[in-house]
Amino acid sequence: MLRKVFYISDGTAITAEVFGHAVLSQFPVEFEALTIPFVETESKANEVKAQINDCFITTGERPLVFHSIVKAEIRDIIYSSEGLDYDFLNTFVAPLEQQLGISATPVVHRTHGNMNESYEARIDAINYAMDNDDGQTLKHIDKADLVLLGVSRCGKTPSSLYLSMQFGIKAANYPFVEDDMDNLKLPDALKKNKSKLFGLTIDPVRLHEIRQSRMENSRYSSLRQCRIEVKEVEMMYKRERIPFVNTTNHSVEEIATKILAMTGLERHMF
């Protein structure tokens, strides 16, 4: 039976999940996780406490409880459960109060709930990424913070969306396809925005595997075609002096982090 993990918050529980995943990923075992957001009342907290206690009785093991709860009265109820508590907010707030010389002013939903200008900027970035995905249009490319280039299925779309959702970066992306390979060059609209261009590449064998799952035994997915496209695109990157990274076996988070590090684009945290 897998060890039970609870992610609990009086907000979205995103913070508890992120911290909890980061910690648990250090251990080579699997866990069974349950996320419970918006625990905003004592009644709800007592329901969650009962779930934790029932889990302990059923499994004989204390559940791991990662939480980011602002209200002390709700937090105390979770503390009184049979779970092993990992309280991220309280762990860091008290030492910071000492260092800063001021008391914290806890507000529920402050981390991920602000409907302010920063939030609007993130929504604009997400809309931009979707409207300018896969070379749908180059009319608004001058408004991009970043333009990702690459062959089909190398990770352009997920990287663009992640950068927009996580960091508020307006990221367009443009594909190079089979028909481009005989005379591969940048469209004029991209040449005019060359400082914004960033390339993605991928191991041809891995690209072949990905394309096979999409269009099995087609010319598009053949290993030969994958090798041709990757080779031609990488040659163009070098010719045009476009920075690029290899996405093979890297998560979208890792790809985005490499892009930010290499481009120097400013992160906007929300």
UniProtKB/Swiss-Prot annotation:
Q: Which InterPro entries match?
A: Kinase-pyrophosphorylase (IPR005177), PSRP (IPR026530)
The yes or no answer to whether the keyword Kinase is present is yes
- EC top class named in words: transferase
The alphabetical list of record keywords is: Kinase, Nucleotide-binding, Serine/threonine-protein kinase, Transferase
Cite the binding residues for ADP.
150-157
The record's listing under Pfam families reads:
Kinase-PPPase
Q: Which domain of life is it from?
A: Bacteria
Please give the catalytic activity noted in the UniProt record. [pyruvate, water dikinase] + ADP = [pyruvate, water dikinase]-phosphate + AMP + H(+); [pyruvate, water dikinase]-phosphate + phosphate + H(+) = [pyruvate, water dikinase] + diphosphate
Q: What is its EC number?
A: 2.7.11.33, 2.7.4.28
According to the UniProt entry, its GO molecular function terms are: ADP binding; ATP binding; phosphotransferase activity, phosphate group as acceptor; protein serine/threonine kinase activity
> Per the similarity annotation, which family is this?
Belongs to the pyruvate, phosphate/water dikinase regulatory protein family. PSRP subfamily.
Report the protein's function.
Bifunctional serine/threonine kinase and phosphorylase involved in the regulation of the phosphoenolpyruvate synthase (PEPS) by catalyzing its phosphorylation/dephosphorylation.
List the HAMAP family hit by this protein, alphabetically.
PSRP
The identity of this protein, by name, is Putative phosphoenolpyruvate synthase regulatory protein
Organism equals Shewanella woodyi (strain ATCC 51908 / MS32)
Phylogenetic lineage = Bacteria, Pseudomonadati, Pseudomonadota, Gammaproteobacteria, Alteromonadales
